[in-house]
Amino acid sequence: YLRHGLDGEYDILGVPYVDYECDVERGRHLILYGHNMGVGESERFSSLQNYKDPDYYTRHPVIRLDTLYGSALYKVVAVYALTARTADADYFPFNTYVDFADDEAEQAYLDEVARRAFYTTGDYVRPDERLLTLCFCTYEMEDARMLVMARPLREGERAEADEVHIQPDPQLPARWPEEG
C-alpha cells in the first residue's frame, strides 16, 4: 500500500490504508494512514497538512470518508503532531487505542490528544461515537506525523465550523523546531 496502487502497479503515492488492528465495520476508532508527498492539493493526504492552520479548519470543518461500506461525514475535533520514533521519550502510541475498555479510558485518550493538539474545535466526542484519525507524514522534523481527529457529523447537525481553541503550548515532540 505504501508504494503501489490498487491495481498493484508502482505508485509513489501509494493507497491510504486502515490500521490492521481496526475493526472497519464496528470499531470505535478508525485509523487511516496515507502519504503526504506535498505533490499537490488533491494528492492523497497532502491537503490534510493544511489543517495545521485553524483558518483552514474553519473553511473545511468536515471530512468525507468513502469506503466499500458506504460514505460518512466526520467533523474535525483536533489536529496534533507526533514523533514516529518509538525510541523517543515523548513517543505517544496513538495507534494502540483502536478500542476503549470503558468511557474513562476513552476520555483519558481524548485528554491526551487535547494536550498535544495545535487547537481543538470546541466540539466534543460522545462516548458512543466512532473516532476517525487520519495520520500522515509532515516535514517539520524527521519521522514526524500529523494527525487529524474527527467524529461523525450528527443527525441534523450543520456542517459548519465550531469555535477554535488555539492551544498556547501544545505538547509537541521534543525534536519539533521552534516557531519563529
Task: Name each region found by the language model.
Residues 1-180:
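Solvent-exposed, non-transmembrane regions of membrane-associated and secreted proteins
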